[in-house]
Amino acid sequence: MQKDASLSGFLPSFQHFATQAIHVGQEPEQWNSRAVVLPISLATTFKQDFPGQSSGFEYSRSGNPTRNCLEKAVAALDGAKHSLAFASGLAATITITHLLKAGDEIICMDEVYGGTNRYFRRVASEFGLKISFVDCSKTKLLEAAITPQTKLVWIETPTNPTLKLADIGACAQIVHKRGDIILVVDNTFMSAYFQRPLALGADICMCSATKYMNGHSDVVMGLVSVNSDDLNSRLRFLQNSLGAVPSPFDCYLCCRGLKTLQVRMEKHFKNGMAVARFLETNPRVEKVVYPGLPSHPQHELAKRQCSGCPGMVSFYIKGALQHAKAFLKNLKLFTLAESLGGYESLAELPAIMTHASVPEKDRATLGINDTLIRLSVGLEDEQDLLEDLDRALKAAHP
């Protein structure tokens, strides 16, 4: 699919993406039946030829044929050597964190998904890990924050929900001045289609596949991709030891979702841009935040490290909390719900929904106030989306 001329200026799409999404790890020749659709292997245990001699699978937690196919496909799409699937995005986060030991320090982007913030702040810190929250979009702050105890840097780009970007390459240069710090990039918002963190210098690319990678709001899953054989070996040991693996059925569904990732993301980009432009010219809107708009302070960075933008659009409605609630109440096509990245359009109020667990003082500093609304723009007809937003804005501000 060719990008609309008005959406140009970003990196070119990654070569062979759709072909790899459809075929890698799913070759019919690997099945006796020659099935062209990935079979679902529900078996929990597998017959061994001799005691202690398996044919590649022993117990489904340790390895499953359907999960293996998904992991091969994701590795290809992330431009990675290895990929691992987990039961959720947070399960992936927890497993990565187990690479560390008590006394180590994590530097985390100051603005991240609320669940990530909660896990680092209230759970990981209880196990002897030091957590520092830093605005990694400012590389000087990142460099100043690194201590001898720093072992992992966690960045999210774009951030959730204010869509702030971090320069992955610049962060990697700073982090890798020391040979013992792991750089993790949460790629949930961009997906493998629009951004490849490993190619930009990250050590680990992770995402919540619940969102764009699966894209149908019917799977909870996390994905982790790496190029390092050592990191892959350590993470696979933890994947098996901690046991937070997805079901074979969910792996099948995610594989199916990947096959349409390219066409979905192109449509999300088109619709997201249309919504952002509409909101930016609306008198009832205070400010729009979308990396695809020239008005975004890091628009040029987005064009340098991404091949496009997803359907995530955040904006500040004029007025106060009552106006934000009125707007959300009067939406008909957009569904009031958490999560994102599905084919259906969603709207939410981060301050009291997805980011309610973030301390109020931190929310205020980050700009997550009572008038910030986050949209996950879906695949519906563009005009229908714009009319729904226009109607709800007029209802909030008669």
Curated annotation (Swiss-Prot):
* Function recorded in the entry: Catalyzes the last step in the trans-sulfuration pathway from L-methionine to L-cysteine in a pyridoxal-5'-phosphate (PLP)-dependent manner, which consists on cleaving the L,L-cystathionine molecule into L-cysteine, ammonia and 2-oxobutanoate. Part of the L-cysteine derived from the trans-sulfuration pathway is utilized for biosynthesis of the ubiquitous antioxidant glutathione. Besides its role in the conversion of L-cystathionine into L-cysteine, it utilizes L-cysteine and L-homocysteine as substrates (at much lower rates than L,L-cystathionine) to produce hydrogen sulfide (H2S).
Gene3D superfamilies of this UniProt entry? Answer: Aspartate Aminotransferase, domain 1, Type I PLP-dependent aspartate aminotransferase-like (Major domain)
Q: What is its main location?
A: cytoplasm
**Matching Pfam families, A to Z?**
Cys_Met_Meta_PP
Name the UniProt record assigns to this protein: Cystathionine gamma-lyase
Give me any GO biological process, just one: cellular response to leukemia inhibitory factor
What does the subunit comment say?
Answer: Homotetramer. Interacts with CALM in a calcium-dependent manner.
Sites where the protein binds substrate: 61, 113, 118, 338
Question: Which PROSITE patterns does UniProt cross-reference here?
Answer: CYS_MET_METAB_PP (PS00868)
Q: Which gene encodes it?
A: Cth
CDD domains of this UniProt entry? Answer: CGS_like
EC number in record: 4.4.1.1, 4.4.1.2
What keywords appear on the UniProt entry? Amino-acid biosynthesis, Calmodulin-binding, Cysteine biosynthesis, Cytoplasm, Lipid metabolism, Lyase, Pyridoxal phosphate
